[in-house]
Amino acid sequence: MLNNFLGKNVRIIDDDNMEWRGYVRSIETPEDSDDGQWWLDIVNVNKPGFETGLSISEHEIKEISEII
């Protein structure tokens, strides 16, 4: 499911109820990750301190939607 967001602008609510917005630059599949989870690499993140991007795992994501 998360692979549908590759190359899209997204809005994410994480497990701490924080909102993140950015562009999904790459995805790591469960087969490729060390912990067997999906991972999203987000760039152009809307929060100070995350200028180089954000990596977030599937279990940290409560909600995700495409920003059109």
Predicted regions and their residues:
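Conserved RNA-binding domains used in RNP assembly and mRNA/RNA metabolism
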Residues: 2-68
